[in-house]
């Protein structure tokens, strides 16, 4: 099933239970300059559900790749694989020291908005879900241009949502409904879920998800106020 998201009135994520660890995928961005700045190494990142042990996706040259077994926040195997493809990637200028700055430093882009790069959407496919299972997902976005629009679509879900503006300006902070979105109680129809991002220059910085073994035992966490040191992004000439 092809679905698009509805806007949530409140942004929250179900608390990860002991047997439902978080899984995080971070896109490092253009690897030519300062790759380390876009790598989450030993840091905690995620402004809605902070976690460690992020999986770093190197996408600096061909913007395509895969990870055979994503590591969970506990450092153990998740049994979930990831494969991604996009026409372009980019990164911020300056430095990144905290985990959240490192996550927002690099991103994979849809339709780069320049004659230098080909057009096309970003697709990320996660495989290894159990059909009918529930999970939560958080999407973190970034951009190198003011007002870029991004539309996210998830396939193989029994849920819906809508397009949204991924953020304004050269500031890599995460803002609810603008540069980060949390979706709760998603239902997998098959064993894989594909996230597609379209738009002009829209960038995907990271994805988190948390399988929920027992929905009745989940506890909602409110959003914490977590400040990020903003760093400027540089537009491609």
PLM regions: where:
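C-terminal cell-surface anchoring/sorting signal
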Residues: 1-8, 12-19, 218-237
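Boundary/junction segments of secreted and surface-exposed precursor proteins
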Residues: 17-43
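Contiguous ligand/interfacial binding patches
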Residues: 23, 40, 141-211
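Surface-exposed, low-complexity/disordered Ser/Thr/Gly/Pro/Asn-rich loops and linkers
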Residues: 58-127
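A short glycine/threonine-centered beta-strand motif
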Residues: 126, 139-142
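Short, flexible loop/turn segments at beta-strand junctions in immunoglobulin-like
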Residues: 127-130, 185
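Extended extracellular/luminal ectodomain segments enriched in beta-structured repeat modules
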Residues: 129-137
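Residue-level detector of conserved catalytic or cofactor/ligand-binding positions
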Residues: 215
């Amino acid at each position: 099933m092809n679905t698009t998201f509805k806007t949530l009135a409140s942004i929250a994520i179900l608390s990860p239970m002991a047997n439902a660890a978080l899984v995080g995928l971070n896109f490092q961005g253009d690897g030519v300059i300062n790759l380390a700045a876009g790598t989450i190494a030993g840091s905690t990142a995620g402004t809605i559900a902070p976690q460690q042990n992020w999986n770093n996706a190197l996408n600096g040259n061909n913007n395509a790749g895969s990870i055979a077994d994503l590591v969970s926040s506990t450092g153990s195997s998740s049994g979930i694989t990831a494969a991604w493809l996009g026409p372009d990637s980019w990164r911020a200028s300056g430095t990144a020291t905290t985990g959240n700055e490192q996550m927002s430093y690099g991103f994979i882009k849809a339709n780069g908005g320049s004659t230098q790069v080909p057009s096309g959407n970003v697709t990320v496919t996660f495989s290894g879900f159990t059909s009918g299972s529930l999970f939560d997902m958080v999407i973190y976005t970034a951009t190198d241009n003011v007002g870029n629009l991004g539309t996210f679509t998830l396939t193989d879900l029994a849920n819906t949502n809508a397009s949204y503006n991924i953020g304004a300006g050269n500031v890599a902070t995460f803002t609810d409904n603008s540069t980060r979105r949390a979706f709760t109680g998603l239902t997998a129809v098959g064993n894989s879920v594909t996230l597609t991002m379209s738009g002009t220059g829209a960038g995907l910085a990271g994805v988190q998800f948390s399988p929920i073994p027992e929905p009745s035992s989940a506890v909602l966490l409110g959003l914490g106020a977590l400040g990020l040191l903003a760093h400027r992004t540089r537009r491609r000439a």
